[in-house]
Amino acid sequence: MFFVVTMTHPDGAGWGQHVMAHVQYLNTLVEQGKLRASGPANGLPLRAGLLIFSVADRAELDALIAADPFATEGLISELTVIEWNPLFGTFAAEATPIAPPRSA
């Protein structure tokens, strides 16, 4: 299953103190094939990141997010999670097939 996650972080010393541990954690998830893409969101008033996960289910995703150093240090001020079915593009071969619409 694919999930698109956004994380918003408060500005402050905590972000700078824990950003390298966060990046190392994300790199580990990339190596494991669980995090497929990630990066900062540009042009927003607060620091934010977008992450695309490919995991077995929502429970696995929740556990991965909970283990992120930004989460353990209380540095996620807003989190959104959307289950995503990438029918077109780079991840399409891994999408869940859906039946085509019936014609009238």
Task: Describe these PLM feature segments.
Residues 1-104:
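Conserved, structured core segments of small domains
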